[in-house]
Regions:
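An alpha-helical, amphipathic repeat domain used for nucleic-acid recognition
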Residues: 1-191
Length: 191
């Protein structure tokens, strides 16, 4: 990353430094740098963004973060994101739908909503994604998670830990406690 007057100018490769004949501590022609920025930074930012979305769906927030990590300035980032949206490479509504569909059987609604909100996905798109992908029975999911986390024979001793685990996953206490108690009741009925 090249810094001019202690501010990030953008990412430069070794070949760019040779091409521009840059030397640490020496003054540089601002016009030459501005022209270089126009010629290369926008194309490189687009290439990096497309490489990021090549293998998996990304949201606008992910692309912005990736380009910021690579030291691109806000103008380059905004232009790149707008082009990606224009060509439908980035669509937060589609991202929300894909995310909900792929996580709905393993995570609670609350956990999915929190993850999408952290990526700056609008509440409207999150709700639409849940409408497109109806929630399975949460009780079944909680029962499966309890059985996966702890065998029924050990559940009595680890009850509080299992409940805390499921509460952290975003499931409501009443549902979790009912499921744990049902498993314990079934276990004692068998014995």
């Amino acid at each position: 990353c090249l810094y001019l007057d202690y501010e990030a100018f953008g990412p430069l490769y070794a070949s760019d430094i040779k091409r521009l004949k840059l030397i640490v501590g020496e003054n540089t022609d601002a016009e030459k740098l501005t022209q270089f920025r126009k010629d290369y930074f926008f194309k490189r930012a687009m290439d990096k963004a497309i490489a990021a979305i090549k293998y998996s769906e990304k949201c606008e927030y992910d692309i912005r973060q990736k380009l910021q990590e690579l030291c691109y300035d806000n103008e380059v980032i905004e232009t790149t994101v707008e082009k990606l949206k224009k060509y439908k490479y980035v669509d937060d509504a589609r991202y929300a739908s894909v995310y909900v569909r792929s996580h709905i059987n393993r995570k609670s609604r609350r956990e999915i909503t929190y993850a999408l909100s952290a990526k700056k996905i609008s509440d409207e798109w999150i709700e639409e994604a849940f409408e497109e992908n109806p929630l399975p029975d949460e009780r079944e999911i909680v029962m499966r998670l309890i059985q996966k986390k702890c065998p029924a024979s050990e559940l009595k001793d680890r009850r509080d830990k299992v409940i805390a685990y499921l509460l952290r996953k975003g499931y409501p206490y009443r549902l979790v406690a009912t499921c744990v108690d049902d498993i314990l009741r079934d276990e004692t009925a068998v014995i």
